[in-house]
Every structure is written in structure tokens, then in C-alpha cells.
Amino acid sequence: MGLKCHEFVHTVPIKKRQKILEQFNNGDIQVLIAMKCLDEGVDIPSTRTAFFLASTSNPKEFVQRRGRILRLAEGKNKATVYDFIVVPRAEFMPLKRDIDASLLKREMPRFAEFASAASNEFDARSKLWDLVNNYEMLNLFDEKPWDMYKRLIKDKNTYNL
């Protein structure tokens, strides 16, 4: 493909990270591959496209990641974010219902948050509508991430007694 890529991870020294960001901002590097580095403290406003492959149910983390990409920059009027979510198979399997429902409860609030701010909100929601409806969980399209996160923490503490 001829893309110039560079890793942007915690093992890269701070001074080298700054140089990498400069190269990215001026176009010498077209792709940054980052792990956890977009959660806090890194500004990359020139980014126009991002692919989030590591999911988190922590709203603070995913809002910060998204915010790093959506910052204003000269010549940039929008950004495209692809947030990959994990969902059950399309074919409903009653024996796995509890596992699949748990997965949806974790992923859907983040999806709903991202979709609500997206230009393709209704198209994105329609792609998952039938799947979520099979589990009778359409309410997840409107659940707020912080509410879900607090519920997950409470459930985790309940089971760890």
C-alpha cells in the first residue's frame, strides 16, 4: 500500500514520540499504531481517520480517545472514527443467551454514545437493530455509558463478595 507507519506505544521514549507526532502532523508518517496512548495526554488534532480496535466499557477512556481524534485542526472540518464493537453472532442461539446478552450490555452504550454524535447515526443503528431486538434489549440503544459503567461496577462488586 505504500503507507508510512509508526508505532506509538508506551515503550517509545517521550522525545521520540514528539518527533513522531511532528512527522505525522506534516504528513511524513501517514499511520500511527497506538495502544492506550490516546487515553490521556496526547493531542493529535490533524488525525482525520481513526480505527479503535480495543474496546473499553469505561466512558472516560472512550470519550478521551474519541476526543483526541475530533479536535479541530487547520484544514480539517470532520474526522471519521471506526469503533469496532463485539456483538453476538447474527443467528440467535438460546443456549448462549446469557453470555450474548452480557456482551451486548457492555458494548451497546459505547455504540449508542458514538452513534448519537455521528453523521450516520441512523444507518449505524439500523445495522444492529434486528440483532439487539432478538435479545429484547432495544433499551440499550438509549442507555447512557456512565449508567452502564456504574451498573457493571456494582454487579462486579456483588459477585466478588
Residue positions per predicted region:
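Conserved strand-helix element at the start of the C-terminal RecA-like helicase core
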Residues: M1
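Conserved RecA-like P-loop NTPase helicase motor core
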Residues: K4-F122
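Long, largely alpha-helical accessory region at the distal end of helicase-like NTP-driven motors
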Residues: M93-L161
